[in-house]
Amino acid sequence: MLIYGSEASLSFLAESNDWFMDGTFSVAPPQFSQLYTVHGLRNGHHVIGCYGLLANKQGDTYIEFLQQVRQLTNDAQPTSIMVDFERACINAITVVFPQANVIGCLFHLCKSIYRHVQSTGLQEQYLVDEVFRTNIRMIAALAFVPLGDIITAFEELSQHCEGNEDHILDYFEVNYIGELRRGRRRNPLFAHTL
């Protein structure tokens, strides 16, 4: 693991209450799995605080990375951290920064839904069928529904959809709503609070 950032960027990150983190794989050198960035937001300015070259996407790796970032930022205590929906990273954040409010990134949520559209062979329908496309977009719009109304809104949307949306709704239900079994909802993979 390699972590790098300037004194100024790490200082900026240390003084930022809101952090944003993401990894990318295409630009990582061959001996690493991903390039991970941690950004800070302060006074309307968004700056990359540090970069990390990580060997894999395992929880222990994320924990070690975040502990090092915390040390490099003089034990910074961000109040919120926005991330993609990577379970291992979310778990690591709750270990290293338990006080931080973890927020899921809407862009990554939409990207995840669209990847599922593609993997189920529905990309062509998404491109040509405006009603289908709108219904899929309405699934992602559930992110804007008040927490107490998410399940009801999901159920209403499910009743509204009449076609291939079921494949996407099933995926969304298991991961983000909580699958209905024997009259009770299981916990989703990702909490509604994300």
Question: What does each model-identified segment do?
Answer:
Residues P30, Y51-D75:
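Active-site beta-loop-alpha junctions of metal-dependent nucleic acid enzymes
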